[in-house]
Amino acid sequence: MDVTKKNKRDGTEVTERIVTEIVTTRLTSLPPKGSTSNGYAKTGSLGGGSRLEKQSLTHGSSGYINSSGSIRGNASTSSYRRAHSPASTLPNSPGSTFERKTHMTRHGTYEGSSSGNSSPEYPRKELASSATRGRSQTRESEIRVRLQSASPSTRWTELDEVKRLLKGSRSASASPTRNTSSTLPIPKKGTVETKMVTASSHSVSGTYDTTALDTNLPSHMWSSTLPAGSSMGTYHNNMTTQSSSLLNTNAYSAGSVFGMPNNMASCSPTLLPGLSSCSSVFGMQNNLAPSSSVPAHGTTTAPTAYGVKKNVPQPPTVTSTGVSTSATCTTSVQSDDLLHKDCKFLILEKDNVPSKKEMELLIMTKDSGKVFTASPASVSTTSFSEDTLKKEKQAAYAADACLKADINGDLNTVSTKGKATSVENHNYDRGGGSGGGARGGGGSGGGGGGGGTWGAAPAWCPCGSCCSWWKWLLGLLLTWLLLLGLLFGLIALAEEVRKLKARVDELERTRVQYFEDKTERSSKDRLLGDMPGVGPGLGKAELDGHSQEAIWLFVRNKLMTEQENGNLRGNPGPKGDMGSQGPKGDRGLPGTAGIPGPLGHPGPEGPKGQKGSIGDPGMEGPIGQRGLEGPMGPRGEPGPPGSGEKGDRGIAGEQGPRGLPGVPGSVGPRGPNGSPGPQGPPGSTGPQGLRGEVGLPGVKGDKGLAGPPGPKGDQGEKGPRGLTGEPGVRGLPGAVGEPGAKGAMGPAGPDGQQGPRGEQGLTGMPGTRGLPGPSGDPGKPGVTGPQGPQGLPGSPGRPGTKGEPGAPGRVMTAEGSSTITVPGPPGPPGAMGPPGPSGTPGPAGPAGLPGQTKAQRGEPGLAGDSFISSGSSISEVLAAQGVDLRGPLGPPGPRGPPGPSIPGPPGPRGPPGEGVPGPPGLPGSFLTDSETFFSGPPGPPGPPGPKGDQGDPGVPGTPGIPGGHSHGESSSTTYRQGPPGPPGPPGPPGSFSSSGQDIQRYIAEYMQSDSIRTYLSGVQGPPGPPGPPGPVITITGETFDYSQLASQVVSYLRTSGYGVSLSSASSEDILAMLRRNDVWQFLRQHLVGPPGPPGPPGVGGDGSLLSLDYGELSRHILNYMSSSGISFGHPGPPGPPGLPGTSYEELLTMLRGSDYRDIIGPPGPPGPPGPRGPPGVSAALATYAAENSDNFRSELIGYLTSPDVRSFIIGPPGPPGPQGPPGDSHLRDNYSWGSSSSARRGTAYSSSVGMGGANGGSLGEGRTFGTGDGGPYGTDIGPGGGYGAAAGGIYGTDGDSFRAGFTGDLDYNKLAVRVSESMQRQGLLQGMAYTVQGPPGVPGPQGPPGISKVFSAYSNVTQDLMDFFRTHGAIPGPPGQKGEAGTPGPKGDRGLAGQRGPPGPPGPRGQKGDKGDKGDQVYTGRRRRSIAIKP
């Protein structure tokens, strides 16, 4: 890289060139060991036929002679010499690869000023493997040199400069090992200081030490094969001290290069970047007298190049020994020659390898303290050619060194390929002591005559010394030969062309003639052919006309044949007269191209033209555009006050006598102010003089010092208030606050209607009594419901460890409709607290006494714990959301007397007097308020915890307050105060978990009940695929027979007159057909029949519907149809999609709505716990449900199906199912459910659960038939719901749903009846044509939990809800104000307080509601809280 800088210093223009040279040498192999050399001139003795290749590349920048006459310039030579070392002691290591990378950046020399760039510092960074010192020698020497030489007086610069220099890169570079002579004497004024540091490896015994010395520097291992000044073998370096330790870049100037002693006299500090003037290069002693101090920067002044002494004086014309500033156009040869290093290695050059290090080369030549001549302008490389030098490649960049003042010599390059004899290389001119350019590069280039007497190029040669006259002559001759060759070639070519043209013309003529002849011949033939005729003589012949004709034809043909054969042609007649010229013929086709002539021989290459001499510097360019205005400089120092001393004050004139006032003269120009005279008596005021002309503006004074800062301005007035920002987006609901303090118990709500009595669950052993939860404020006494039978108090079971969540319990409705498996609250129930409310409700006890108004609700029974434990019990969730978990009580079963240990399920919730419901109690409490549970949209029930040990059947709690109360308050439905709500499902009293599990199961069952499922199905997200579908089991437990179903469907289709040809019927067609409303109804009514109790849960699809494989069903139907010859019409277009299920927001809104506020309202005080039922919660619930089945179910269903709850449960609406015919939103959901989900197995369950799969549990797959999404209702549901579950799913979306659906025997009639019944009960099917309500079948086993639409996960709804809540927190409805308590039922006897379930996700802490008033206040408080929280 060549960068030229121009600086003006001291009025002298100085041009510097920075030459950055990157040299990478790579040692790829070592020559054979056999190559030894005696080290003398004849290196031909190298063993092994070794070959020496030298490639020298010299970059020389043209010197510039400034006004002081010194040449400024620098040159570096990096030469790559591939040669075998003559006498290397390094062993042969062919496998080794040795790389050397050198990066040199040299700056031009500097004038003697100490300005910032005056120091000719060549930044040099090198990594040498030789030992390093703390601070590199080069740096130290460099600083020393700069300090001493920078200023003309050679005085040391200030300490700060020293510090600055030292601070630059103290140990940034590693210096080679110090030679014994490496101490740099402080250069004296007038001496030349040269310092070249060569990075080299300390190679001993063939080991290349390539340690990177400074990790801060880029990793770069630079090893040179040349011993770094250290004796290579046992040779000692017996040098006298060499001044300034010139480390020659190629050969150590005073070091023995190849281990031979160098008994040289100390060299003067001459700078020899190339071969140092005093070095023995190949072990030859260089017994040269020290060369003069002339900076022969590159001339190999006295080196023994190849073992040959070079006593080459420097041409005197170039350098006068004493003054180095005179035109020292010595050629600079820096032969970074590995030949001078260990030539035993073959070095390969890598040009493109960026150097990792920069070699800072400081070259300083100080002359009389003023001028530094870094390197002569002219650079020539001496080519050492010995007999052993087989090939030499030199590229010399030589600048014209003519001494041209103020002219920058440009870089001229001439590449010379060839061999130079040693005679040419060695100039034996005995002129000067200092080595001159071997070929007079300095002489000829510099205009000196000392460039060698012969062998030098003429002065006009631009390359100075790179070529000789005979080369030029040879070049000219070659050029002339080339030109002559070209000329002859052209002449020959022209002749060829001429011949070709003549030939072409001849061919053309021949062709034309041929055509003419042919034409003439043909015309003649025609004429001849016409000539024959029948002569008159023939006519007289005996031949008749016919024979004559035949003869004529024969003869004619014969003649024609002969003529064609040319036999009849006579001699040409005389040439006829030339006819008139015919029309010009068409242009002939171009002739075929002739064969290309042979290529001419390439002419001789012309001689290379001479390189033009350096042109004169061009005229000075026009002044460049004005540069952009620079940034304002720092404020200048205030200038000195303006010049000009104030004049002395004039002497006051004497006061003259007062003259008479003169006539006012015209105002003269204002005279200069005279020095005031003594004040005379005031004269009369003269007329005002004319105003003097404005003087020229004075020179602008220097800018005054900046004034002190002005006082701070007064603070601006406050700006007007900004416009009120638009209200921010509503913030996410805040974390659910902790439940507010319980509000005072509201007045008891009117007794809720007693729900149908649930079947009496087995009396659970009384669980340990849960710690009583804080009682809610007593609700207003509700009407006392009939007291549920008091369950035996279960002995409180010790809290069992949380069991695995049990399967969802089934709620047995009195009607026997399929139990809905409501997933119990997820999570194993928490450890059993003190006995919760009575254990599983035994048979409903007599109605509890009306709860006290808003007595504080006991902590939810253990079951609650379970829920809570599950962490996501629905009630918790709801409570957390501020929705009273106790939703509207499901129709409370008569509340059993509280089991002693396990709190009976709270009776029907009293009016929710409580403030925010505590964490949901054990599910029992939920269940107790089964509606309550649902009232808040139940959180997804956690997976039922493992059933805890069965508590002893709780002693029937005192009858809970009539469920009515609870109902009334919790749900919109009036809770019947009478019998306490269904006893909370007591878990097995023994453990919380049991109770929780039972409750969970109860809830699961309940949720799986048709009504709830229907409700949920709409609400829930698509049921997750239940476990693998179990065989579709009919309610009776028979495996569902697809064939039967198919036959029934086909029969129905036949009777209905559908006419789709079997050939065209596909599963899709059938599915579509099955989706038709009438078919759905048929399936629902006839096939499904009244929904039976939910089938046993399928394994995933244990519910009959769950495992219904709709695809299979459709295939069966097709098969059946094919066998029956029934054909269907194409399915009609799908009905409009059912309305979307309630969305989560809608649910929340609904739950918060006034209608459901009651449902959600704080549950009334728990009714007296029912007698502890058998531990199974479901049984207790069942009992309760059985006793209050109607109310209970209706309430539960109502609650669950209430938009609020549905919205809640649904959470975000599941993906809409395929469009079903519009149906009730539930149906629609179901449909979509069914269809979408039915395609998904999981949906079934959920749908079954959520969808209201008919079978409730049956729907294992969720889709079981009824369940399927639409579950049976799918069908019911709608056109969509396809076959039931198939509904949407079945055909709806996937045929395979079908498969999902019917894999086992399914009692379709029962299923349909149940489904329809449950749907009708819920009012879902009111729009449907059929209202068949079969007696509810026995509840089937719970189906596997379906995915709740809300949560879209495959799990129990409870689990889903719980998960959902865990994930998202309770779904905070904006906490509604506490719902008005239903008419508080009389407070039932307080069930044993269950242990307080782990608090549900804290709902937003409601503000304490006003006491009473149906607990509104509590909700109200909550709402207020939420309001406060809301953005």
Curated annotation (Swiss-Prot):
- Locate the compositionally biased regions of type Basic and acidic residues: 1407-1416
Q: Which residues carry this modification: Phosphoserine?
A: S547
Please list the residue ranges that the record marks as compositionally biased, kind Basic residues: 1421-1431
**UniProt membrane topology term:** Single-pass type II membrane protein
Q: Where is this region: Triple-helical region?
A: 570-1417
Protein keywords = Basement membrane, Cell junction, Collagen, Disulfide bond, Extracellular matrix, Glycoprotein, Hydroxylation, Membrane, Phosphoprotein, Repeat, Secreted, Signal-anchor, Transmembrane, Transmembrane helix
As for subcellular location, the record says: Cell junction, Hemidesmosome; Membrane
Low complexity composition-biased segments: 60-74, 657-673, 738-751, 778-799
Source organism's superkingdom?
Eukaryota
GO terms for MF: extracellular matrix structural constituent conferring tensile strength
Show which residues sit on the Extracellular side of the membrane: 490-1431
Q: Which residues lie on this side of the membrane: Cytoplasmic?
A: 1-468
The annotated region (Nonhelical region (NC1)) lies at 1418-1431
Residue stretches of biased makeup (Pro residues): 823-844, 889-911, 937-946, 979-989, 1162-1174, 1212-1221
Region feature Disordered, mapped onto this chain: 25-155, 167-188, 304-324, 422-449, 564-869, 884-996, 1158-1178, 1208-1249, 1366-1431
Show the ranges annotated as biased composition (Gly residues). 430-449
Q: Where is this region: Necessary for interaction with DST and for the recruitment of DST to hemidesmosome?
A: 146-231
Q: What ranges does the record list as Polar residues composition bias?
A: 75-96, 111-120, 170-184, 1232-1249
Q: Which residues are glycosylated?
A: N1230, N1356
Enumerate the residue ranges of region (Nonhelical region (NC16)). Answer: 1-569
Q: What does this protein do?
A: May play a role in the integrity of hemidesmosome and the attachment of basal keratinocytes to the underlying basement membrane. The 120 kDa linear IgA disease antigen homolog is an anchoring filament component involved in dermal-epidermal cohesion.
Q: Indicate what this protein is called per its UniProt record.
A: Collagen alpha-1(XVII) chain
What is the organism of origin for this protein?
Answer: Mesocricetus auratus (Golden hamster)
Annotated gene: COL17A1
